[in-house]
């Protein structure tokens, strides 16, 4: 609602609750749930809310595995300007981000991962094929934020032998 700590933000507000059951019902029908950044007070007043906050709150409420943000920027960048392909929540919080919209997206991505969403992605809507590249290639096209490092290599141990044999067995033929 538009009043926080005694300050009236007029027609701007925050998400107070999400109809998770309604959203899941739409998704269960294999339909797309299109959500606007508008909220309604109990009195019927209309408030503008942050689209990234709506996405964050809905993703958490429905138990989403993944949350994808589209922005002009292709993702988060290191101090040297290099695109960060993946990072943990802690390392994302530590980034010094100047752009206000990038801060909002980073904050929503980190909060959603902290509250149960496995992965959040920040991609550019200006790059053709960015979504497909992010989802179906090793390096992706933007920034992946996750609670823990998403991809880690480790040395095989004795417990891995059965799985390794299963993987290479078709190659023996």
Task: Describe the residue ranges of each PLM region.
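C-terminal catalytic "cap/lid" subdomain
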Residues: 1-172
